[in-house]
A protein has these predicted regions:
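Alpha/beta-hydrolase active-site loop
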Residues: 2-51
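Primarily recognizes the serine-hydrolase "nucleophile elbow" in alpha/beta-hydrolase
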Residues: 41-104
Length: 192
């Protein structure tokens, strides 16, 4: 009980070393998207080899945060593959290329905050190759995009996301306000 009293209500913070190197690191862009597309093509080959059919006109891609960002990249790289994107809080540029990632675990006795710094954030990059606004400019999008975005998203403000989607064919924005938060499916109006 003595240790619990010492720790009670405290927050501990520390930088976590991410084990990345030149051969294995989170590139956060096109390479990750190509990995996803390769996995999908392998799945398609397995289905074909086993005589299993699927409706090629009903392939959707879903993601949350960085996963939704990757969904947009996959759609841009393979514009006729997906009939739709379900986007939960995608940013338009990889957030962690400009910011450290902070993860907080709130426990009963104390909280632990971890800070991750990705190797890719220190590299010189062609920013346009990561920027969805640039990549979708003039792009003839065929996928229906259904986007869920909170009014208080701290990673990408709603007005920026709305402006982007206004310029993309087939995009529909569902704004998450306090009225939609139910604590189960929708837990906040922030980045979730």
């Amino acid at each position: 009980a003595g240790n619990q009293q010492i720790l009670h209500g405290k927050t501990f913070s520390g930088k976590i070393e991410i084990r990345e190197n030149a051969q294995e690191f989170n590139e956060m862009g096109m390479n990750q998207a190509m990995d996803h597309l390769m996995a999908l093509h392998i799945l398609q080959d397995i289905l074909k080899e086993n005589g299993l059919d699927y409706c090629r006109d009903r392939v959707y891609i879903y993601g949350q945060s960085h996963g939704a960002y990757l969904a947009y990249l996959c759609n841009r790289l393979a514009p006729d593959l997906f009939c739709g994107i379900i986007d939960n809080s995608a940013y338009l540029f990889p957030y962690y290329l400009e910011h450290d990632r902070q993860v907080t675990k709130i426990g009963e006795i104390f909280s632990l905050q971890k800070i991750y710094h990705y190797m890719m954030a220190d590299q010189e990059i062609d920013r346009e190759g990561y920027d969805l606004e640039y990549l979708y400019r003039g792009f003839d999008n065929h996928a229906r995009i259904i986007c869920y975005h909170g009014i208080d998203d701290e990673m990408i403000p709603l007005d920026e996301k709305s402006s982007f989607l206004d310029r993309v064919n087939g995009a529909l924005l569902h704004t998450i306000s306090n009225r939609e938060v139910d604590g189960t499916t929708l837990k906040s109006t922030g980045h979730s």
